[in-house]
Amino acid sequence: MSEEVVQDAPLENNELNAEIDLQKTIQEEYKLWKQNVPFLYDLVITHALEWPSLTIQWLPDKKTIPGTDYSIQRLILGTHTSGNDQNYLQIASVQLPNFDEDTTEFTPSTIRRAQATGSYTIEISQKIPHDGDVNRARYMPQKPEIIATMGEGGNAYIFDTTCHDALTTGEALPQAVLKGHTAEGFGLCWNPNLPGNLATGAEDQVICLWDVQTQSFTSSETKVISPIAKYHRHTDIVNDVQFHPQHEALLASVSDDCTLQIHDTRLNPEEEAPKVIQAHSKAINAVAINPFNDYLLATASADKTVALWDLRNPYQRLHTLEGHEDEVYGLEWSPHDEPILASSSTDRRVCIWDLEKIGEEQTPEDAEDGSPELLFMHGGHTNRISEFSWCPNERWVVGSLADDNILQIWSPSRVIWGRDHVQVSPRDLE
């Protein structure tokens, strides 16, 4: 027994020293990042949350405040207390500085104020009790007051925020409980073309399809809803699902089984998916379909890459985006510019890619900084990034969360992205 302890001690010391070295490197990188913020960003707002949040999404509304230099915009957040406290679905109100409408950028005075004083506030404006950690939360596009969540116990929940007070206490009382999964999950997506149509994916390897449009919700009753269809097509954890932005019957899913699958919800769910693509050599964590281009799709993987695909011929990869140093978990196209894609990783970075730059010639010096399509790398977090979200109302504004409770709202400098973007064809990526 004593020999085993002696043998294990050097290994433990090595791991401890490696962790100390890593934390030292992270702090040095953060210090360097902070020094360069005035040159790299038009806006940075940092806010410490009470508890970590695994999920973030901007709501679509924007409230202009007369006589001020800012607007009020809102974020959906959750809590991740790991059983140490009551969990909540949260709405945060964010003061965002006004853009100069003529140049679609922040005015210089507001940039300096935001960077120097942190004068724009972030406040939790609504807290709704939630059963367990909030793994994912998304609003219904047709009715933003309706929010779906994925919980840690396998159930999904529907909340009507108008049925809850600003700071609700007590037990969780969702408007509906969606029972269909036997394990927790993170896959959650509303159908943008079919109100009330919702897809979920979980660790039980199942995709569930739900219809909540026919339900009428009240503040006093929690309804139990069963799925209208279940897909047992993956052979491992389903990590993400996304409906096609233009076609209501098309649903994409990705899994630890390394496949990208395209489903047609009009077909028999007992049959094999119409398209099954072995997209990566390791687990696929996220999928995103371009909102402007019907055929352009991206996947993010544990192999540290993002892959681009053409839905007309998805069995041949268009291009690989390389720049992350660890597993890629987050993926979202810009809602404003067709060729702009962002990704996040356990390497504590959010990368912004410009597909128009694929194939551009580089000097050896530029090549050392990454591929030509790597437009920007946000390095403001010192812990693993949970999720990020593009702001729908302000071009080039992103909100991102890290496991250390830090929420950041940021916008790269116009010097970096300042040019008009044109449409990109999948043929140009080949």
Curated annotation (Swiss-Prot):
Stored InterPro entries: G-protein_beta_WD-40_rep, Histone-bd_RBBP4-like_N, WD40/YVTN_repeat-like_dom_sf, WD40_repeat_CS, WD40_repeat_dom_sf, WD40_rpt, WD_repeat_RBAP46/RBAP48/MSI1
Annotated PROSITE patterns: WD_REPEATS_1 (PS00678), WD_REPEATS_2 (PS50082), WD_REPEATS_REGION (PS50294)
Keywords carried by this UniProt record: Centromere, Chromatin regulator, Chromosome, Cytoplasm, Kinetochore, Nucleus, Phosphoprotein, Repeat, WD repeat
A UniProt-annotated Pfam family: CAF1C_H4-bd
Phosphoserine modifications at: S425
Annotated site residues (Important for interaction with HAT1) in this chain: L296
Principal subcellular localisation of the protein: cytoplasm
UniProt GO molecular function: H3-H4 histone complex chaperone activity; histone binding
Signal peptide: none
Localisation per UniProt entry: Cytoplasm; Nucleus; Chromosome, Centromere; Chromosome, Centromere, Kinetochore
One of the record's GO cellular component terms: kinetochore
UniProt-listed GO biological process terms: CENP-A containing chromatin assembly; chromatin remodeling
UniProt KW Phosphoprotein keyword: yes
Known partners and oligomeric status: Component of the HAT-B complex composed of at least hat1 and hat2. The HAT-B complex binds to histone H4 tail. Component of the CENP-A recruiting complex composed of at least mis16, mis19, mis19 and mis20.
Protein function: Regulatory subunit of the histone acetylase B (HAT-B) complex. The complex acetylates 'Lys-12' of histone H4 which is required for telomeric silencing. Component of the CENP-A recruiting complex that ensures the integrity of mitotic spindles through maintenance of kinetochore factors mis6/CENP-I and cnp1/CENP-A. Maintains the deacetylated state of histones specifically in the central core of the centromeres.
Entry protein name: Histone acetyltransferase type B subunit 2
Organism expressing this protein natively: Schizosaccharomyces pombe (strain 972 / ATCC 24843)
